């Protein structure tokens, strides 16, 4: 449950002999509480099947929604999550190099910014994790990677994080 949250490409080295990615910089590592890890797992698993109700419950557990959030704002946030989980929702190798996902997330996020009355800053754990996810997406796009993200995630989709 420890994540290195710095998306800088220079923090890693690829070892061709072992075919492993090696982390060089541990300065931005953060422990994540089991309940946050489990809520993100639920969020991603429910996004795969398009279960907006479960996505909403998981996002609430992470801390995305204030108690007074309007339904429109809630749905806009869920739209962004569905976009962000597109590589997970895709069956087979996702083509990061030919994806316009970053632009679509930007556009969906702009819609959120017009609803200032019900917006609040997500918890720091969420912000650091999103920074890392965005960095991984940009790296995969730069490398024109084709990755079956869904197949990588599914074996872990129903596990609970150890306490």
Positions of the model-derived regions?
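Helix-rich C-lobe and terminal helical cap/extension of kinase-like folds
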Residues: 15-163
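Catalytic-loop of the protein kinase fold
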Residues: 2-9
